[in-house]
């Protein structure tokens, strides 16, 4: 057991985590050179296309160190985006140490900080590593100072390596063996194993990734899931050397996967503890805090026949992604679907894309909203995650919107632009610290403004140099109103949005204009209106198409022309009272882009 090392790799987006893991696998002979490909651990097609890590992946390697001993390294590659920070905290719960990878050209960024603090809070040994030293722009000395200055860990003798060229990889491995402590645990105690992750395999049922904290997990054992109290037999277990390899037992301190024919998707929740059926442990391992979704959106299948398969797909996906929340919802415009909660817009995009790809569904998404705390006049407090659920205006005493605390790191030269952006987003500055050439800014910005397009605009105002980390802070009273969109006098529930009163007029007008371009012309006029309660704030009209009924009259009598026009008018009138308007998918997505192209 003293030769086991469990660690995660944490870093900001694009600082080279996945490439470093490739090199570690290669130098320990986990895969032959023929099987080696770039970013071997990013196994999802989506991850490869976007070049980002979404799911944490684990690998077990054997490394023969310079002191002649062979060490077993279990490591977990983690994502860097703020939307997937939950994956990171789960991975860290299974480790004793973390490699903090910092790009020697870019230096410390917001995510580096956030992930590093998470690791330090969990009492992990943090080992700094300077990556990409082969770049001409690399300044390892400056970055090492920056790590000490901003993060506050010792970094003068940080290992310098280049994952791309393979320089210094040996030193990284030696550093891991030397600095990261061996796992603690009692092999003779009752079994306790933490479920780090699980996913659904169509042949095997639920496959779980576990970390054995105490005791030994053997093939054929009868185990019990502590939260549900159900027992299962262990059919297969093993490790990833990125390939799945079967073994007969997992010892204390090891990380591996197991299959025990759980057919029910909720059978082995992530963060749960497994123990032995005959000799159960008394206490549950401390798991991870459940994350609350920050952004909600409605997802509806385009054809209602897909509803069943959509429900199953969501179930399977939520097993693999514990931060996804969903509940059934129905809309008059879109039929039956689900209200889903996500950690951020990127997360929402990824989930939608995974549903469409892996489960072959066609979906419509409604505009994302955040959760509002609403105090009603009778003193009851409710949480509203969709504009349709907002009670009528005269029943509302106060609406409180969620405020996010945003930590930004950026070069001084972009400070002005970023402050302007934050003010425009109704932000309040709470802190500003200079670290050499970098500035650490802290703002409190309404969550609704952050999730909409804050990240994209922060990146574009700072030419990609600013980095952001945000988290929910509190609810705060604000003057929010619901803007309804009416098409021919009928409210379309899927198009409603909750906005701040100051922006309502502007957002309403913009949305109405946008809808006008997207709704196809019909044989009659279509009025598109934006309303707050009964008060109309904006209107535009999609002009009717009309046939020239006078084309066949040559000169002729005016009463003849009047008769034809009158007849056409009556026809249009009848049509208008009966006709209903098809709203195309693009129109629902228009809401997403309102307020973006300023």
From Swiss-Prot:
Q: What does the record give as EC number? A: 3.6.5.n1
Any matching Pfam family: EFG_C
Sorted alphabetically, the Gene Ontology cellular component annotations on this record are: plasma membrane
Q: Which reaction does it catalyse?
A: GTP + H2O = GDP + phosphate + H(+)
UniProt KW Cell division keyword: no
Main site of residence?
A: membrane
Residue ranges occupied by any tr-type G domain in the UniProt entry: 2-184
Any one Gene Ontology biological process term?
Answer: positive regulation of translation
Membrane topology according to the record: Peripheral membrane protein
> Do you know which InterPro entries this protein is assigned to?
EF-4, EFG_III/V, EFG_V-like, EFTu-like_2, G_TR_CS, LepA_C_sf, LepA_CTD, LepA_IV
Q: Where in the cell is it found?
A: Cell inner membrane
Give GO terms: molecular function aspect only: GTP binding; GTPase activity; guanosine tetraphosphate binding; ribosome binding; translation elongation factor activity
Against PROSITE patterns, the record matches this protein to: G_TR_1, G_TR_2
Per UniProt, GTP binds at 14-19, 131-134
Q: Keywords in alphabetical order, please.
A: Cell inner membrane, Cell membrane, GTP-binding, Hydrolase, Membrane, Nucleotide-binding, Protein biosynthesis
Q: Does the keyword Glycoprotein apply?
A: no
What top-tier enzyme class does this entry carry?
hydrolase
Q: What does this protein do?
A: Required for accurate and efficient protein synthesis under certain stress conditions. May act as a fidelity factor of the translation reaction, by catalyzing a one-codon backward translocation of tRNAs on improperly translocated ribosomes. Back-translocation proceeds from a post-translocation (POST) complex to a pre-translocation (PRE) complex, thus giving elongation factor G a second chance to translocate the tRNAs correctly. Binds to ribosomes in a GTP-dependent manner.
Q: Show the PANTHER family listed in the entry.
A: TRANSLATION FACTOR GUF1 HOMOLOG, CHLOROPLASTIC, TRANSLATION FACTOR GUF1-RELATED
Q: Which family does it belong to?
A: Belongs to the TRAFAC class translation factor GTPase superfamily. Classic translation factor GTPase family. LepA subfamily.
Tell me the protein's name: Elongation factor 4
